[in-house]
Each structure stands twice: as structure tokens, then as C-alpha cells.
Amino acid sequence: MYFTEGVHKTQGDSTKRKPNQIIMDSKTLESHLWEAANILRGSPVDRTDWKSYILPLLFFKRICDVWDEEYAEMVEMYGEDFTDEHRFQIPEGAHWNDVRETPKNVGTALQNALRAIEAANQEHLYGVFGDAQWTNKERLPDALLKDLLEHFSALDLGNSHVQSDIIGDAYEYLIKQFADATNKKAGEFYTPRSVVRLMVDILSPKSGETIYDPACGTGGMLLGAVQHVRDKGGDPRTFFGKLFGQERNLTTASVARMNLLLHGIEDFAIERGDTLRNPIFTDPSTGGLATFDCVIANPPFSLKNWGREIWESDPWGRAFAGLPTDNSGDFAWVQHMVTSMALGNGRMAVVLPQGALFRGGVEGNIRQYLLQQDLIETVIGLAPNLFYGTGLAACILILRKRKPQAKKEKVLIVDASELYRKGRAQNFLDIEHATEILSWVQEYKDVKDRARIVDLNEIEEEDWTLNISRYVLPPIGEDIPPLGEAIADFKTALNDAREAEERLKTLMTEGGWLDD
């Protein structure tokens, strides 16, 4: 990407490091970034909207600092007369320092700069900054914006000061903090990363495979696939051009795109749109949906008014197993994802409320069809209250287009409901819990009180329910006493209660509160 010579002269001074700038490790960076939220605390900006302002500012500062760094290197190598080439164009007047030096109407200057950068980099950045209303002075007065700009200006976010993995992790840290701050709203955009890791590790994407998340939120599933390959010693660059996501919320889709870019992933497709009503990724050669090696999602639980009227004559053939009711889109998501799996090695992982395992009616019929077609490979029941915004217990379903011979006409059913760490307002699936669940799935064998391989014939006898307690009995607690001891303890407690009642009655009578 090329810049005009005029751009260099207006922005070159910003390459010099300021005396007060911080050289970051990850903890320093994360702490400084979260302090930006404290600047907004008590302002007219609702905490549910903090991410709409802070995350774009972080991304804006990062690309400007990298631009400055690249420019300084070229000047040092070639002098002032050279054709400048950058990853992203920063048009004249749209640099961070231009906005920082604006004396008034700062929001207007900022919004104009962000839109100019998007327009100059349409292939990669168009719409990436979202739709935050920077010009609303009632919410964002000049003084507040200047405080935010100065706070971020203390950071040098060029590559020589902070690597892409560190700034990417810091961005993920901010997303997690915003999720914690908003809780109920967070379920719309954030999946706990231990759950992401478990799902990705089960699917085990390989270098060069295509990955698709039809409800991609902030991009955690796609990043998880890249990290999985990196951890296995593969080259994550083989995923360039092979990561796909669709997200209905504009701000969340923008956050996902910034997230991938800050992690150094340059070539991907995150599209905004309603997946169930208007899927973006299609295949003109077949006239159907595009298909992918790995399909992975945590869609909204039991979504109402999800688009049933479209599916009554769905042009993409997604209602192949049945048409779900308008009150719950759970099996609409499942059928969309099944339709999006590639032939051969296509596989998928989806998070659903556990009610999807046993609800009857049309959902029971769809579940029966999926089982009879031998698509469901594994069911994992999770602990309650792991996800933001709901205390419901969830499950993970693993489906595969073509099971290996050893798994045909069988389903591995896992009860992981006891694996969690209890928190004050939410439970947590820690890495050690996810690792244990993964081992059960990979070993694919019975584990006492935890996992069981169930034949389809047995599931048919249970009327096609996948209710986990029908197949895996919860472990009997070791602290349950023998029957005789329990009866004796009960009698003692009963006698103690009667004696306490008599003492209370005597005291109240003596005090005149009760008549004799």
C-alpha cells in the first residue's frame, strides 16, 4: 500500500518516542488499557457501550504507531526521497496526532479521521471502527475525549514496543473485562475462552482448513482455531483467507475484525448480517451455502423470532430435518451449521442450552433425524452458570459428516456438570477441567460416572432423548453416611429442634408475649 509524499511530511515527527511513554509487558499494557474504562466511569456513556469507544481508540493508536515506525525505518534506510509502502494507509489529516492536537470539536475530528482511514483501506478496514457516535457532545464532551486521547498517547504501540501477540492478548483482555462489567449483555458477544479452547481442541483444525463461525461475536472461536494450530507447531498463516464469520451486531462485528487484525491475522472475512435470515457465505457454483471443514459457534440460546417465516421456503435447504418453532432457534442454528459442513471431513461444535437435548415436539423430531442420520458424535453436559447472561446449564454437541467406522451408530455422552470452579456471581470452567473433558472425548471410552458410549438402539428405546441423566448416572457423593447413621442423626436433630421450641415457648410465656 502506497502513500503520497505529502503525507510523510505532516506525520513524520510522531516517530520520536516521547519521554513519558511506557514500554509494555502484557500486565502493564492490560492495566493501562483498563484505566481507560475508569476515565469513562461516571460519564454519560453507559458501561455497556464502553467497548464501542475504547476498542476503536486502541486500534486507531496501534495502526498509527506502526505507520510511524515503518516510516522512520524507511527514512533511515533511504532518506526522504522514497516510495512509501505500508500495511495500512493513513490519509493526510487522519493521523492520531492530528486528532490529538485538535483544540475543539474533537469528536468530529476523530470521527472524520476514522472514516477517512476506512475509506483509504476499503479492502481490509471498511467499517472496522463501528458506528459509535463520536460527535455526541452530551455523551462525549471535548474534555472527556481529550482525557482518553492523552491516556492512550502515553503508550507507544509500535511493533518495537509491543508485539502483535501481546497487543492481541491485551485486546482480548479488554473484551473479557467488558464482558465482566456488563454480564447479562456479554453473552451476546463473548464465550468463555476455556469453552472456546475445549471446542476447538475437540475439532482439532489442521493447517490450511477452512473455519466458519456463523455467530462469531468478537471472533474468539476463529482465534482459537489459529492458536490451536500454532500450539501444535503448525503455521497459522495457512489460515489466511480461510477464516469466515458472520455477526448480526455491527459493533460486535467490528470488534471481531479489530481482534483478528491486532492478532496479526490479515486475510479473513467477517461479515455483518443475520445468519438465519440472510446467510452471507454462499457458493455460486452449487447454488447452495458455502461449506467449511470446521464449523463452530455459540449462538444465542433459544432465540425467539429468529426467521421461521424465511425457512418455510428456505432457498438454502436448511430445514432438512424439520422446521423449528418461532419460540426457539436452537435447531435452526444446528441445521444451518450442518448444511455448512463440508463433505468428507466436515465437523462442527455448537453450544446449546441442555433443554435442546430432551425437548419434544418438532425439536424432538429434528433431534431424532440427526441421530438416525448418524451425525451426532458427542454430547457434553456442562455445569450451570458458566456463560454470561444465563444461569442455565449448557451442552456442547459435536457432529460430523462422516464418522470413523469405530464411532458409527454410537454417541459418546459426557457428564461434566461437576467440573467447575464456583465464583461469586458465575461459575468457571478452568483449563484443567477442559483438559479432563478433552481427554474423555479423545480416548472415546466409558469413564465411570462421567462418560459412556451409547448405541443408537438404546437411544431409540429412550424415545430419542439425549438427556444425560438417562445414560450417565451422577456420582454418589462420598460424604453420604450409611442409612443407620443417617436415621440416628435425623432423630437427634428432631429432638434438638423440639427442645429448642419448648425453650422458646417458655421464654415467650415468661416475657408476656404468649398466654399460658
Task: Give the positions of each predicted feature.
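Charged, amphipathic alpha-helical interaction segments
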Residues: K61, I175, G219, R230, ...
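Non-catalytic, mostly N-terminal accessory regions of nucleic-acid modification and defense proteins
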Residues: M1-S207, A269-I280, G381-N385, K407-S417, ...
